[in-house]
């Protein structure tokens, strides 16, 4: 028996990152983690900075960093419109570690809500990139 699947498109402002048949995806929505399986109810939600975990048609996994965006779920197709999307294999670990260090430094030295909020957002993005790098390595 063939696994149930649906079509997924992951698109950023720069290019189409993924287009193909998948078994499921996992992504961080505005209200928390979402697992999208075939037959999921229609949904439109914001995506928080993090990753999308894609389980392809034959079980192979792929991880893509998303800086945020929109997730649209329809009966036979799911579309991710990302602000920025970077494949796990294309992320620079040294750069992500440096971004994390700088964000932590800004948080510790912030003077006001705006500085703190911006530094917290940058820290979340850096941590998400590092997580995608880690999971991509494990999947290889």
Curated annotation (Swiss-Prot):
Mind listing the UniProt keywords for this protein, alphabetically? ATP synthesis, Cell inner membrane, Cell membrane, CF(1), Hydrogen ion transport, Ion transport, Membrane, Transport
List the molecular function annotations (GO) for this entry: ATP binding; proton-transporting ATP synthase activity, rotational mechanism
Q: What is its main location?
A: membrane
Q: Where in the cell is it found?
A: Cell inner membrane
May I have one GO cellular component term? plasma membrane
Q: What span is annotated as the signal peptide, if there is one?
A: none
| Gene3D superfamilies associated with the record | ATP synthase delta/epsilon subunit, C-terminal domain, F0F1 ATP synthase delta/epsilon subunit, N-terminal
SUPFAM superfamilies in the cross-refs: Epsilon subunit of F1F0-ATP synthase C-terminal domain, Epsilon subunit of F1F0-ATP synthase N-terminal domain
One family name in Pfam for this protein: ATP-synt_DE_N
Topology with respect to the bilayer: Peripheral membrane protein
Note the superkingdom of the native organism.
Bacteria
In the record, the note on similarity to other proteins reads:
Belongs to the ATPase epsilon chain family.
* Oligomeric and partner information: F-type ATPases have 2 components, CF(1) - the catalytic core - and CF(0) - the membrane proton channel. CF(1) has five subunits: alpha(3), beta(3), gamma(1), delta(1), epsilon(1). CF(0) has three main subunits: a, b and c.
Tell me the NCBIfam families matching this sequence.
Answer: ATP_synt_epsi (TIGR01216), PRK00571.1-4 (NF001847)
User: What is the stated purpose of this protein?
Assistant: Produces ATP from ADP in the presence of a proton gradient across the membrane.
* UniProt-recorded name of the protein: ATP synthase epsilon chain
């Amino acid at each position: 028996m063939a696994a149930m699947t649906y079509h997924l498109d992951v698109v950023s402002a720069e290019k189409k990152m993924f287009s193909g048949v998948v078994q499921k995806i996992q992504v961080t929505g505005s209200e928390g983690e979402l697992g999208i399986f075939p037959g999921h109810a229609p949904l439109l939600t914001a995506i928080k900075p993090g990753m999308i975990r894609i389980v392809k048609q034959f079980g192979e996994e792929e991880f893509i960093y998303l800086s945020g965006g929109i997730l649209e779920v329809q009966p036979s197709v799911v579309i991710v419109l990302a602000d920025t999307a970077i494949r796990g294999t294309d992320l620079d670990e040294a750069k992500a570690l440096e971004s994390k260090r700088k964000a932590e430094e800004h948080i510790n030295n912030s003077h006001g809500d705006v500085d703190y909020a911006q530094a917290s957002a940058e820290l979340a993005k850096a941590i998400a990139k590092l997580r995608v790098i880690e999971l991509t390595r494990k999947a290889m």
